[in-house]
Amino acid sequence: MELPLDNVDLSKLSPNFLKFNERISGVAKKANYAIPVSLSTEVLALNGPVLHYILNSAKGGNETAVTQRTASTNQQNTLQNSLKINESDPITKELWEKIQKAAETNGKAKEQGKSKKQGTEKTTTLTLLKTESSQQSNTTKDGKATSDEAIKKTWGDYQKVENGLKGYTFKASVFENWHELLDFSARIARSFTNIHTKETKKGTDIQGVLGIDSTPNALFTSVFAAGGGNYDNFFYKVQDGRADFSNFKNKETSYQNLQKVFSDYKELIDKNGLFVNKGGSYSSNFQKFHQLAYSISSTSGFFYSFAGNSAKRLKFDDGNFIEFPRFTQPVKAPNKTTQSGGENNNKSENNLLGTFEIEDKSKKRESVESSEKSSSGTQSKSKKGKSMKTIYLYKAQIPEGKNKGDNAILITNQTVIDKLEKAAKEDGKSGTQVSTIASKSTTKENQENKIIGYTSTDNLREDNKNIFDIDDLNDEKYDRKIIVSATEEVLEQSNTLQSEEAVVLPAPAKYKASDSTKIAITQEPNLIGIHANEKENEETRKFVNWFLNSEQTWESKKYSKNKQNSNEKRTPAQFFADSASYILPLKKTFDNANKKEDQSKANNKTNSQRTNTYIEKALEIFKGISQNQITSYSDPSDFRSGRFRDGIGSNFNAVVNSKVDFNKFINNFIASLGSDI
């Protein structure tokens, strides 16, 4: 049974974030049954370098550089019917400047990478440039041009087509409502053959224009916005303690608005321009490699959304890839040192598939300058002085002297065995694509340390094609996987999206620009009490009150210099929310939102940390909700809510592949709901 959280002091919380308690079905009385302690919302992250290439190509910027030596009449023909940027609008002008700056940053990163390889080779080029005319000197590439050239390699040439960007006027407001955003996205898709002609996409292909991590969120908020931010016009509402789905079942406003929203999406889907998360494959996995122009995702995912200065990924033989997982070790082919693996008979010589190393936490850390193998060949020291332990992978049986789960794993999947053995036999194939000049001696050494696969305890989904489950080691808290038929790629910084190259905006707050109400989703877990007995109920309320209101002293490295511990006084709820990149909806947080944002930037600058622009945008959005400038949306709570959400999401995601019409989509959706709705 539910437990009303009476006698809990909620006065510090903004009341607008407690209103969802009014939309809980099946409760005996109106009360606060749930408390939001870890809020997030959604943002629209623009890939600045990609969007610059798209807009600059459509406005003729790249074509003009090619035709500057031609007659002025030809230039005018080139620019005729080109895209226009409405720079008379100050918001659009500011956005375009941010996009240009992002492309400049991306291009400079590529040029800096070149300079490291080329040294002083630019001297001759600069001398030649001085002899060119002043007109030609204007075509000297800056960072933006360099960035555009890099993006073009994957996005391909811009095509000037009808219903594309030809004659289109770009303005910042296209990102403020779903109708214009989807129309703009479809125009981009029509303008690039690498998008609209590719029905089947490999992991390294352009995935689309717009990426959406949660299609239920996108559909719910757009339909809610189209209904004026009123639950009476939504799919369902809670009335008299019960959930009422009649608006949807009777094909009233919510059904009709869903049909309009679907029609807008269908234009983009038909041109292969929409990427949706179908379970773990987030938009950021592709946007960070310039494979999307922009995406909508949760503000809690900032630290997963951008690449580092030296991004890596694992590319599979079929052309697909995954971002290089955390907690991953290379699996090396057997060599003279490891071949026996401590075995004492020749019958087991081909039993060993490979080895990998993990930190041996049972050994005391010592400081050493280089890796050294111990006399047994199973213990070594890393360059950081950590004691390392060799783990052996066997295919037939674990030999005497080795212990399953301790220093040995038995591989029973024949596909894994075949792929590891094949990789070990292949000549000249390395597990990492890097530029190296190797001598004969180093070539021999590299062969002895040949990478034939990878193993990881990161959160990976096995596909039984390239990623497989294997046995865990003793005391491991997470499932271990083995990755085969993969090559590690180290990417240039210019080929990835850095956080400073993204322009972060709120997710569309309206369905159409003419809508009177702005909408923003609020999501993530709430603190909920469960009824037990009077004594335990009271103790539960005391805990919740302590969690929300009792300040404690915490050790923190977050805002301290040199990552040294410092003491901070915060409530447990504040500590929890901050640690997980969520927001606790305190009144004072929104009253001091600008001050908090400035302090966050200053702290990040002092500690050379990336500014969490997602949290900054969330604070801005939540401040609007707190001050009644934005209407908060969250799913009304009912035992059928999850089925409704899952059903609309899975059936819409299926449309992205099948491209069926609205009638087929809605019939499949209704069929998935069952008789309860």
Curated annotation (Swiss-Prot):
Which spans does this entry mark as compositional bias, Basic and acidic residues?
104-120, 358-372
Identification of the protein by name: Uncharacterized protein MPN_364
Its domain of life reads Bacteria
Family the UniProt entry places it in? Belongs to the MG185/MG260 family.
Which InterPro entries does the UniProt entry name for this protein?
Lipoprotein_10_C, Mycoplasma_lipoprotein_cen_dom, P68-like
The transmembrane segments are: none
What the entry lists under Pfam families is as follows: Lipoprotein_10 (PF03202), Lipoprotein_X (PF03305)
